[in-house]
UniProtKB/Swiss-Prot annotation:
GO terms for biological process: ribosome biogenesis. One of its GO terms (molecular function) is GTPase activity. Mg(2+) binds at S172, T192. InterPro entries: G_OBG, GTP-bd, GTP-bd_Obg/CgtA, GTP1-OBG_CS, GTP1_OBG_dom, GTP1_OBG_dom_sf, OBG_GTPase, P-loop_NTPase. It is an enzyme of class 3 (hydrolase). The gene is obg. This is GTPase Obg. GTP binds at residues 165-172, 190-194, 212-215, 280-283, 320-322. The keyword DNA damage does not apply. It comes from Campylobacter jejuni subsp. jejuni serotype O:6 (strain 81116 / NCTC 11828). It comes from the Bacteria.
């Protein structure tokens, strides 16, 4: 199950209370204080792990707490520190204050560890309060309470390439043939209901991560279709690949314009992201000479429009995932773009 947003209360452990204790030995009837200190409460720590791809482990949990520190004991024995609670999250997880929407942590790198809530300090035992005018203090400190915070965990997938297109244009088929991802593929809209990540091996030494985002429809930036729930996943992709389908009733030019407008409404930064264009289902030209001519005119109209707006795309390529034509060229084109972006960071 893919879960990319949860609300939960997190709490670090309370400090253990200090002990009130006195030495009791056979020949020392009125021994001095020997109360040990309470142990510190456990911390809340976030750990980023790229073997985890969803927040499903947090689903249905209202609160998670680290262990409290143990109380101090006699003979100056200190209480044990409470165990830390380590929360394993995928790359791309943000920890957000649920009340102010402030981003508190942004976990983007494998192995990243972040202390989020410090456990409460253990109280001092009565040993610490002995002084000249009070040789037998009968009090100790309570432990300090741990911290508590209501947060929202939001997952934004991190990928090198994000596929952008209407539903059922061939994105899932593409990622299934170029990567190790195996999405559901069928001839109906919104087959992809959750984002999918796939590792694309270009050659023996080079690879990149591709994200198949559920199809975007006009009005997605306002919440239509699968809307905002998945547009956010494109935000963390370095390069966008628009997948346009010549078999749709909407011309290629119009598909491109609508998709770009939805990205612009959602995020100006996303609108300015580098991108390429892939014409999918290029095998559809086999449906007859007249249909092939229509597709050629459709592509020419798109190319003329791109010239009018000064060719903002990095490339335009025709691909057939079914016949596996253009795939090798596409992978190398994407790799070159990704290498350039990585070098410019």
């Amino acid at each position: 199950m893919f879960i990319d947003s949860v609300k939960i209360t997190l709490a670090s452990g309370d400090g253990g209370k200090g002990a009130v204790s006195f030495r009791r030995e056979k020949h020392v009837p009125l021994g001095g204080p020997d109360g040990g200190d309470g142990g510190n409460g456990g911390d809340i720590i976030f750990v980023c792990d790229n073997n985890t791809h969803t927040l499903v482990n947090f689903k249905g949990k209202r609160e998670l707490r680290a262990q409290n520190g143990a109380g101090g004991m006699g003979r100056n024995k200190n209480g044990k520190k409470g165990e830390n609670l380590e929360l394993i999250v995928p790359e791309g997880t943000q920890v957000i204050d649920a009340q102010t929407n402030e981003i508190l942590l942004d976990l983007t790198k494998e192995g990243q560890r972040e202390l989020f809530l410090k456990g409460g300090k253990g109280g001092l035992g009565n040993t610490h309060f002995k002084h000249a005018t009070n040789q037998r203090p009968d009090y100790a400190q309570p432990g300090i309470k741990g911290e508590s915070r209501l947060v929202r965990l939001e997952l934004k997938l991190i990928a090198d390439v994000g596929l952008v297109g209407f539903p059922n244009v061939g994105k899932s088929t593409l990622i299934s043939v170029v990567s190790n991802a195996k999405p559901e593929i069928a001839n109906y809209e919104f087959t992809t209901l959750t984002p999918k990540l796939g590792l694309v091996d270009v050659d023996e030494y080079n690879s990149f991560v591709m994200a198949d985002i559920p199809g975007i429809i006009e009005g997605a930036s306002g919440g239509k279709g699968l809307g905002l729930a998945f547009l956010k996943h494109i935000e963390r992709t370095s390069f966008l690949l628009f997948v346009l389908d010549p078999m749709r009733q909407m011309p290629l030019k119009e598909q491109f314009i609508v998709l770009r407008k939805e990205l612009e409404k959602f995020s100006n930064e996303l609108f300015g992201r580098k991108f390429g264009i892939m014409i999918s289902k290029s095998d559809s030209v086999n449906l007859g000479e007249e249909f092939a001519e229509q597709i050629t005119l459709n592509i020419n109209e798109l190319e003329n429009y791109l010239k009018e707006i000064n060719n903002p795309q990095s490339f335009l390529i025709k691909v057939s995932s079914l016949e596996k034509t253009g795939l090798k060229e596409l992978k190398f084109m994407l790799l070159e773009e990704i290498k350039t972006l990585r070098n410019n960071k």
